[in-house]
Amino acid sequence: MMNAIVVYSSQTGRIEQIAHAIAAGLPQGTPCVSVDDMPDDFSSYDCVFAGFWIDENQADPKGQEALKKIGNDHVAVFATLYDDPYSDQASKHLRSAVELLKPGSGVIGTYVAWTD
């Protein structure tokens, strides 16, 4: 069975909702925690799902700090923003967030949702 964790930084609750929806699709008991409560080490997890909101064209400050601490071979990144999720700008935001991950981390997927 896959051992995963979902971590998120949320201001309005939208990313938290998405995080819990992701966790609901994973094996029962998969942790879903705020970045304030995330572990220091992710090596015991097969996969890490990391969520944040986009603030001024980049991951929010707490999200940035969390991404810098995440190192894993299988990381899926998800975000919300006030823009077209299919735009070049959204791609740039995700790319800049992925670049914050610890060196050697493997990104297995990304997702961005528009929020109002």
What do the predicted segments below correspond to?
Residues 4, 25-33, 44-51, 55-116:
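FMN-binding flavodoxin-like domain, especially the glycine-rich phosphate-binding loop
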Residues 2-25:
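N-terminal beta1-alpha1 ligand-phosphate binding loop
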Residues 11-12, 38, 55, 83:
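Short beta->alpha junction loops/turns
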Residues 1-2, 38:
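Detector for methionine-enriched segments
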Residues 38-44:
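Short amphipathic alpha-helix with an adjacent loop that forms part of the alpha/beta core around
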